[in-house]
Amino acid sequence: MSLNEPIKKVSIVIPVYNEQESLPALIDRTTAACKLLTQAYEIILVDDGSSDNSTELLTAAANDPDSHIIAILLNRNYGQHSAIMAGFNQVSGDLIITLDADLQNPPEEIPRLVHVAEEGYDVVGTVRANRQDSLFRKTASRMINMMIQRATGKSMGDYGCMLRAYRRHIVEAMLHCHERSTFIPILANTFARRTTEITVHHAEREFGNSKYSLMRLINLMYDLITCLTTTPLRLLSLVGSAIALLGFTFSVLLVALRLIFGPEWAGGGVFTLFAVLFMFIGAQFVGMGLLGEYIGRIYNDVRARPRYFVQKVVGAEQTENNQDVEK
């Protein structure tokens, strides 16, 4: 594929989960931004098992006769990245842009992403300027970004921002990957030859609350660790060797102290022994837990169950007809 292959159609993929308050503004602003493009476009909204009225709103928008919207309805909540992969499976564009539904990253940035991608980049990432999140979210994101950069060797400043553009061959390569734990920005960068980042505006969340709770962030961290690299397993071996050496050294020291100071001194060191023992046992349990995470991922992949189940697709035929009329 030529690096400067022209972009004839743009697909926007937006995962939606309980975003009924923001959906009207999201649809209006995204459509307005896409109308500024010189290319044909489609807007794919993936309902990730919402429990509010998001499903009804998406269905109504997709059924609009003048709509460029396709609504993909999943039967339950599978997570943000699985929902995006469901959208990827439906796209027909040469350039695919992902966007969150909370409007913290404005859809008005879409034309700029398309313009940068036309310069020949496989992936166009973004960095949130003046990020409007809590200190906890900022700190957690910074730590995750550092961990990803060390594991992948690719220096990108903000892996957590989902406002990104991907060439079609990158999306097709990702669709051939069937692992259950998928982090799309990292997966895309493993296939990309040319990547870049641009700074985008970041607004405060106007509607609802973030769907990433503390437990979801912890789960995301484990997903990243286990799907990126096997380095933690190697580190476990090193840590285990270090603990064994430390334990042997400490045992020799205790024997020497007993010989020097007599059995009375050894009786007073029982609590020290227990403290050291608990430290070693704790380290073993941490290692076993991490090893269990890897085994669990292998088990899920071996079962080869689908990432998601699409209950219904609304508006696909209508969107194709609208594109034909515009041509």
Swiss-Prot record:
One BP annotation, GO: response to antibiotic
Main location group: membrane
Signal peptide: none
Enzyme class: transferase
InterPro entries: ArnC_tfrase (IPR022857), Glyco_trans_2-like (IPR001173), Glycosyltransferase_2 (IPR050256), Nucleotide-diphossugar_trans (IPR029044)
GO MF annotation list: phosphotransferase activity, for other substituted phosphate groups; undecaprenyl-phosphate 4-deoxy-4-formamido-L-arabinose transferase activity
Subcellular location: Cell inner membrane
Pathway: Glycolipid biosynthesis; 4-amino-4-deoxy-alpha-L-arabinose undecaprenyl phosphate biosynthesis; 4-amino-4-deoxy-alpha-L-arabinose undecaprenyl phosphate from UDP-4-deoxy-4-formamido-beta-L-arabinose and undecaprenyl phosphate: step 1/2; Bacterial outer membrane biogenesis; lipopolysaccharide biosynthesis
Induction conditions: Activated by low magnesium concentrations, via the two-component regulatory system PhoP/PhoQ.
Pfam families: Glycos_transf_2 (PF00535)
Primary role: Catalyzes the transfer of 4-deoxy-4-formamido-L-arabinose from UDP to undecaprenyl phosphate. The modified arabinose is attached to lipid A and is required for resistance to polymyxin and cationic antimicrobial peptides. Not required for full virulence.
Name of this protein: Undecaprenyl-phosphate 4-deoxy-4-formamido-L-arabinose transferase
Gene designation: arnC
